[in-house]
């Protein structure tokens, strides 16, 4: 497994395959190709009114690619109900290399100077592959996800791959689709010349955020641990 390179990772993602480690200390990586694939439809995200008010209040400030390594470390931290992680040191090194060449990105959410939430993932043409997210304050990861979706829409991305479905994601509009349908969406996305936005702030994305759906009477799932 020592021959895994950033280029090999990108070729794997282009085929719908992604790696995970069995635990934080392992040097081994396994490749995954789920039969049901989680996606967040970029035209069908559900943003409840309470979450929209939080996002639009500007109480939490959002940036991109300011603290990639710190976000990865935070995503790998133990949390209630999750004592182990698939984000090993080797994973962090590989994705750090992808970040330095412009193919992996982070979204950071802060209250004041404190990093309270965020996410990271891989971008490849018109597809963004979400890897992991974290929250240290309630709804911080949801704020990151709303800004991510708004930014991807602005940059003309067509696919947000979440790998699997979770209550947290389905509560915001995430769905699971068959592998064949996913491959079709992926193939289409790889023909698109999307652009990763330079600015993920509320000021830059206000119009795109405001266009997201706000379903009446919908109660979202809570933040993941």
Swiss-Prot record:
UniProt keyword terms in alphabetical order: Acyltransferase, Cytoplasm, Transferase
SUPFAM superfamilies according to UniProt: Acyl-CoA N-acyltransferases (Nat)
Gene name in the database record: aat
Function: Functions in the N-end rule pathway of protein degradation where it conjugates Leu, Phe and, less efficiently, Met from aminoacyl-tRNAs to the N-termini of proteins containing an N-terminal arginine or lysine.
Pfam families linked to this entry: Leu_Phe_trans
Organism: Gluconobacter oxydans (strain 621H)
Membrane-spanning segments: none
Catalysed reactions, as listed in the record: N-terminal L-lysyl-[protein] + L-leucyl-tRNA(Leu) = N-terminal L-leucyl-L-lysyl-[protein] + tRNA(Leu) + H(+); N-terminal L-arginyl-[protein] + L-leucyl-tRNA(Leu) = N-terminal L-leucyl-L-arginyl-[protein] + tRNA(Leu) + H(+); L-phenylalanyl-tRNA(Phe) + an N-terminal L-alpha-aminoacyl-[protein] = an N-terminal L-phenylalanyl-L-alpha-aminoacyl-[protein] + tRNA(Phe)
PANTHER family per record: LEUCYL/PHENYLALANYL-TRNA--PROTEIN TRANSFERASE, LEUCYL_PHENYLALANYL-TRNA--PROTEIN TRANSFERASE
Protein name, as recorded: Leucyl/phenylalanyl-tRNA--protein transferase
GO biological process: protein catabolic process
GO molecular function: leucyl-tRNA--protein transferase activity
EC number: 2.3.2.6
Keyword Manganese listed: no
A single cellular component GO annotation: cytoplasm
UniProt family annotation: Belongs to the L/F-transferase family.
Compartment(s): Cytoplasm
């Amino acid at each position: 497994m020592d021959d895994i390179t950033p280029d090999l990772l990108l070729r794997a993602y282009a085929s719908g395959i992604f790696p995970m480690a069995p635990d934080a200390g392992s040097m081994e990586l396994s490749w995954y190709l789920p039969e049901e694939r989680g996606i967040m439809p970029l035209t069908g995200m559900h943003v409840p009114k309470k979450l929209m008010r939080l996002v639009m209040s500007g109480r939490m400030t959002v940036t991109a690619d300011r603290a990639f390594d710190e976000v990865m470390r935070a995503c790998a931290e133990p949390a209630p109900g999750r004592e182990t992680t698939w984000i090993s040191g080797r994973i962090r090194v590989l994705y750090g290399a992808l970040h330095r060449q412009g193919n992996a990105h982070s979204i950071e959410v802060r209250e004041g100077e404190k990093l309270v939430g965020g996410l990271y993932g891989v971008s490849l043409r018109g597809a963004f592959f979400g890897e992991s997210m974290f929250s240290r304050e309630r709804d911080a990861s949801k704020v990151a996800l709303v800004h991510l979706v708004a930014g991807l829409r602005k940059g003309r991305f067509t696919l947000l791959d979440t790998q699997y479905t979770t209550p947290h994601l389905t509560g915001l509009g995430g769905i699971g689709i068959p592998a064949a349908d996913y491959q079709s969406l992926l193939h289409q996305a790889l023909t698109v010349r999307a652009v990763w936005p330079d600015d993920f702030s509320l000021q830059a994305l206000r119009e795109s955020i405001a266009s997201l759906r706000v379903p009446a009477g919908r109660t979202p799932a809570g933040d993941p641990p």
